[in-house]
């Protein structure tokens, strides 16, 4: 139900809300991306009801949305699933609660944070995912008037407000996109300069590329990478949540 204007030259997107907003997110819209489930929290928090299709998958595989639903249920949301659609509603408004996510989930963390901004009272969300994109989302919401405070590495406290205001915000760069270009340069012995991206966001990846032989120089918002003709192997690479 929004009006969206895209300025490709200035790389800007303007979103204008219509007076009447649809609270139905159809399968044709939601199936295109995993993040489609993220419309549930905002819709139920602001408009008190929502009908949204179960989200599409991604190359990582099928991932359930039970953490989203169970957590929002603790804030007062009632729902049922019928023919692939989540039918959700809340009486009056969502109410803040203390919620511990049973598993680290970027999407569930984002949905809860957004919903809590317009809920009544205080919400404490524990065992949050802490990807840079989540911190960026919080910065955007704070600029829009939300009251968000991190009180631990994986705990966030939110005091609900009546409404959020319109703002202008620059979204952080895409870590996956930037990392992909860096790896491509390393594999093809290329010489690449990436501008407009904070190198600290992929510091771990850049350090690994240095270990395989790439020469990397970084500035405030710039990465220079030159691939090596003698790519080295990394042994015992271990990742963690």
Locations of regions flagged by a protein language model:
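Short, structured segments at the rim of ligand-binding sites
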Residues: 1-241
């Amino acid at each position: 139900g929004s009006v969206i204007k895209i300025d490709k030259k200035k790389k800007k997107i303007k979103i204008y809300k219509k007076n009447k907003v649809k609270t139905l997110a159809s399968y044709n819209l939601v199936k295109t991306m995993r993040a489609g489930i993220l419309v549930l929290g905002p819709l139920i928090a602001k408009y008190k009801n929502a009908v949204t299709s179960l989200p599409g998958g991604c190359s990582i595989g099928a991932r359930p949305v039970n953490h989203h639903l169970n957590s929002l249920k603790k804030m007062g949301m009632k729902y049922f699933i019928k023919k692939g659609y989540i039918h959700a509603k809340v009486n009056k408004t969502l109410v803040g609660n203390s919620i511990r996510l049973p598993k680290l989930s970027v999407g569930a963390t984002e949905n809860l944070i957004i919903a809590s901004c317009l809920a009544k009272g205080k919400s404490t969300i524990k065992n949050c995912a802490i990807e840079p994109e989540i911190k960026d989302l919080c910065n955007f919401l704070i600029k829009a008037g939300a009251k968000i405070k991190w009180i631990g590495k994986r705990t966030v406290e939110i005091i609900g407000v009546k409404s959020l205001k319109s703002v202008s915000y620059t979204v952080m760069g895409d870590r996956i996109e930037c990392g992909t270009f860096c790896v491509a340069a390393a594999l093809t012995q290329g010489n690449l300069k990436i501008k407009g991206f904070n190198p600290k966001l992929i510091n771990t990846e850049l350090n690994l590329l240095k270990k395989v032989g790439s020469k990397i120089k970084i500035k405030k918002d710039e990465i220079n990478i030159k691939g090596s003709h003698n790519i080295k192997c990394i042994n015992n690479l271990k990742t963690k949540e």
